[in-house]
């Protein structure tokens, strides 16, 4: 549409790989899918078997115990639909020159100890913060739920074909 605007464009070294666009009524989150970018295209794969291996779960996040959600556990999905999962199970990363809150949670990084002392004296950082040379923290896995949609569509098609075969028998 003529009123569509691109707000963010994601690129790799060769191509645009995604965009965030809006028009007068909607937001689009786009991943490149043009046929000219693809090879080895196959329409023959068993989506139902893969989909049946997934284990949807009900859960809440530790940080929000009042909200129950339906979803997946990333490391369980990674062996079935690896293209949908980012990160590695139990991964951590080490940060340098870190300021921690009083409860030990991450606050800010790349602050020298001298700058931290100065900022505390100026009141920029709370007195109960702590500076550490290195701090290890979890690097959490994520799931791109949109990567599951083709499996859902293909499974519906496979089940429709099975139903038709049974009805025609």
Residue ranges and their predicted role:
Residues 32-169:
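Intramolecular chaperone/auto-protease modules of tailspike-like proteins
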Residues 1-35, 43-46, 64:
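Trimeric beta-solenoid/beta-helix "fiber body" segments of extracellular/virion adhesins
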